[in-house]
Curated annotation (Swiss-Prot):
One of its GO terms (biological process) is F420-0 metabolic process. Its EC number is 2.7.7.68. This is 2-phospho-L-lactate guanylyltransferase. GO terms for molecular function: GTP binding; phospholactate guanylyltransferase activity. Belongs to the CofC family. InterPro entries: CofC, Nucleotide-diphossugar_trans. Signal peptide: none annotated. Homodimer. It comes from Methanoregula boonei (strain DSM 21154 / JCM 14090 / 6A8).
Amino acid sequence: MCPHALIPFKPAGPKSRLSGILSPEEREAFARAMLEDVIAAARDANCSPVIVATELFDSEDVQITIADKDLSGTLNEVLSQAAGPVLILMADLPLATGPAIKRVASTTSDIGIVPGRGGGTNAIFVREPAKFHVDYYGMSFLKHIRIAQEAGLSCEVIDSFLLHTDIDEEDDLVELLTHGSGKSRKYLEDLGFVLSAENGRVGVKRPVQPAPAT
């Protein structure tokens, strides 16, 4: 049985670095689609998803906790009160699958961690939450390794393409359109996004661009 899966989520104004190709409304809808893909993957791994949101939003059949501190502060408060193992997953991992999440939760170490690109932390399993705290700003991957070491906790770094692939930049959409199969890929395809190859590089294009924000 997998643990509770905490999924931090920002409903309003997400993914600003995609503003060149998605309108504000489209970015919010896309972020929701990615969240739903992550929730589905967590449930496929027999985890119980809990959304840690910056504000209340409509979501059916999932528990929502409102963050009353910054991300790290809120998650650390939850960790301090947890009665058992906890898994933290980012909400922008649309390639996540049940087996990939189970791999993280099945580590025999005290901590299992999947790094993100740019030094971030995309997924982290904490066997004994009272002995660990998170710090999600800056080079969080190295911070979490250090925090585990200082607490005397064993730590496994897990190599997972599906959980390593987060979506922040336009180029990241290539991986989603190539490997994705969930709601977030369908959302992009419904908007007209397709893969394109120019000068030997694969990218994405959208025949009709969104109107600029006013």
